[in-house]
């Protein structure tokens, strides 16, 4: 079935990037954007970092029941599109943000605004995320985006050439 292997590889790749960042910034904030019930932050815990899991309030409420926050971990209810959550992140030791399967639900302009806002608020921070090209987004739309009632995939975030498409966002 389409997607199972891709999801497993995505999680592996994102965890690799988070761990690589923590090697040079062991006390960094590890921020899971749109966390759902994902435990990548905990899986990458080096014993010194601070872990933040962000998602909508109803998701965080369920997460609190099933995956209570650990000692250096916070579950933060928020809308990622509202920058008020920036103030809740202690990035004094650096910050690595990751979004796993999240930006497919955002319009391109919303992703751009979020990325630019984060760049201003967290200088030197790193953002790791997955993205698909327009063809893959159309395939995804036939499966799980339909469940989310997303119809106009043409407006949603997709990347075919990261360097040429994302570099102008600086």
Model-identified regions with their sequence ranges:
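Alpha-helical subdomain
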Residues: 1-170
